[in-house]
């Protein structure tokens, strides 16, 4: 089973790419955003920690997480954002590993981890290849403002700047899918990526019946991604 990581930045089209992989090509997607919502359900350890660190004001009256309030608390405070990530990321990683184990047992040939903060959360180290969805910064802002008309141009800029620079993500990624044009062009770019990420049936079968092969594959992926990060740091 090949594990791939899919990431991007806000309004670059990552969700569209993820949906196309899943709906047209029937590739299993594990969505980190879905898992992130799961780990902060009422009475979960994560939500209890968040309440302790950020106060009762980040909860609704029914005990569910008030995402708007929490977002306001961490959006422009890097320290609080880092604290929140330190609470949520480990729990999401654990849920993701559980999902990956289920996928392996069920014989999936390929699984894509849809993770907005793939590199920030260091999730690339379990991926054989990483994919970043990219677009020009001006197009990114236009899409963000069109999607969220309540935002000002300054708000859009702040949201873009709050994330790891997209150019850095592209440098860290193994594959970049450009999304600077229309949907038809994007779908063509996705189609062109498939030969680079699709394992053979024979390889999938071998990984399933020979667990040591899957373990070896993961070790190779870890070493490869580590090497890529090390090389990247030498040039910054």
UniProtKB/Swiss-Prot annotation:
Pfam families linked to this entry: CoaE
Residues where Phosphoserine is found: 82, 86
Localization: Cytoplasm
One MF annotation (Gene Ontology) recorded for this entry: ATP binding
GO biological process: coenzyme A biosynthetic process
Predominant place of localization: cytoplasm
Keyword annotations: ATP-binding, Cytoplasm, Nucleotide-binding, Phosphoprotein
Cited PROSITE patterns: DPCK
Keyword Cell wall biogenesis/degradation assigned: no
Residue ranges of domain DPCK in the record: 3-208
Keyword Transmembrane in record: no
A GO-annotated cellular component: cytoplasm
HAMAP family in the cross-refs: Dephospho_CoA_kinase (MF_00376)
Name of the protein: Uncharacterized protein C14G10.01
Organism: Schizosaccharomyces pombe (strain 972 / ATCC 24843)
């Amino acid at each position: 089973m090949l594990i791939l990581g899919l990431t991007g930045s806000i309004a670059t089209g990552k969700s569209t790419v993820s949906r196309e992989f899943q709906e047209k090509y029937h590739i299993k997607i594990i969505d980190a955003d879905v898992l992130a919502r799961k780990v902060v359900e009422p009475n979960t350890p994560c939500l209890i920690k968040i309440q302790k660190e950020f106060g009762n004001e980040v909860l609704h009256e029914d005990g569910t997480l008030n995402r708007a309030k929490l977002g306001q608390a961490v959006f422009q405070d890097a320290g609080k954002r880092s604290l929140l990530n330190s609470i949520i990321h480990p729990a999401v990683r654990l849920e993701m590993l559980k999902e990956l184990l289920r996928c392996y047992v069920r014989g999936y040939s390929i699984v894509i981890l849809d993770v907005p903060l793939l590199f920030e959360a260091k999730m690339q180290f379990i991926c054989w290849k990483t994919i970043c969805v990219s677009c020009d910064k001006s197009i990114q802002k236009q899409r963000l403002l069109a999607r969220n008309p309540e935002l000002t141009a300054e708000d859009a800029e702040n949201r873009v700047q709050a994330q790891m620079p997209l150019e850095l993500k592209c440098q860290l990624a193994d594959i970049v899918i450009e999304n600077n044009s229309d949907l038809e062009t994007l779908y063509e770019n996705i189609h062109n990526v498939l030969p680079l990420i699709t394992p053979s049936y024979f390889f999938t079968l071998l990984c399933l019946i020979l667990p040591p092969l899957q373990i070896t594959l993961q070790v190779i992926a870890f070493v490869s991604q580590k090497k890529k990060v090390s090389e990247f740091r030498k040039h910054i």
